[in-house]
């Protein structure tokens, strides 16, 4: 049986949008970043949800564009002494936990995540203390402190497999922070999952009625859905999975049109994978509803060319990720469990 923890819904203020750059400014910052990466012995590690021009720059400079699991692996294994993490803050923290000897920089430390913000350590720790018989599994989209309180860290690409494994051992689960992903995992595994009530501001906005209307316009299109989406959206999907899994599904499915229910940043790499297919954004508004994120994380959008150049050039407290040594040791244990488990799955 799945029991749901009922917490108060929160609305987070969005950061201001970066000032648009003209073509000359973009070229200036691209060249500056390339030079600074070489001078700093640095490599870019970018998430699929960053803007296309950031992903393109990571490609051009020998960096990584991936989901959070592969970002963690890449940064730990790469020979660079400095990692420039283009993403949100928990990704930078994870990189520092796995690579403490490296200098981990971010374009801005103000790049948050609604899942991270929605799972403050004091409240979450008290929640765990109230259920001492449960194994604590937290999503990668959490702070270092929340990871340190967990038994396991997990990404969406291996979430179902891990919960199946723990359920086979007879363990009852606390899942945090994303309630939609928790619901999806519970439905797939039938495990005893007690969910924290967080949500991703992007995926939470996908609308069932509007998606139904879009499907009528494109009846032959396949629907690809990230499991951070509401259950009603997941139930309409032809394929459900993490960002990397959705890109694989786009290649595997025979459909020529794909409706994609995740952050539109994924379109850059997905379109590369299927250049002959048409990608359509799943609607986040319609039927009288409006959207706030409109299928793009506002904190991911903070990773602009100017901010990346400033992060590499200035470093310091405004850009460098620091994780307390004791906290790092505690958070490293569940992270290593995740990586070891993922290795057994060969993902």
Swiss-Prot record:
Main location: cytoplasm
Catalytic activity: iminosuccinate + dihydroxyacetone phosphate = quinolinate + phosphate + 2 H2O + H(+)
Compartments where located: Cytoplasm
Biological processes annotated in GO: 'de novo' NAD biosynthetic process from L-aspartate
EC number per UniProt: 2.5.1.72
Keywords of this entry: 4Fe-4S, Cytoplasm, Iron, Iron-sulfur, Metal-binding, Pyridine nucleotide biosynthesis, Transferase
Cofactors required: [4Fe-4S] cluster
Highest taxon above the source species: Bacteria
Pathway as given in its UniProt record: Cofactor biosynthesis; NAD(+) biosynthesis; quinolinate from iminoaspartate: step 1/1
Ligand binding (iminosuccinate): 47, 68, 139-141, 156, 226-228, 243
Free-text cofactor note: Binds 1 [4Fe-4S] cluster per subunit.
Family (UniProt): Belongs to the quinolinate synthase family. Type 1 subfamily.
Function: Catalyzes the condensation of iminoaspartate with dihydroxyacetone phosphate to form quinolinate.
Stored PANTHER family: QUINOLINATE SYNTHASE, CHLOROPLASTIC, QUINOLINATE SYNTHETASE A
Name by which UniProt lists this protein: Quinolinate synthase
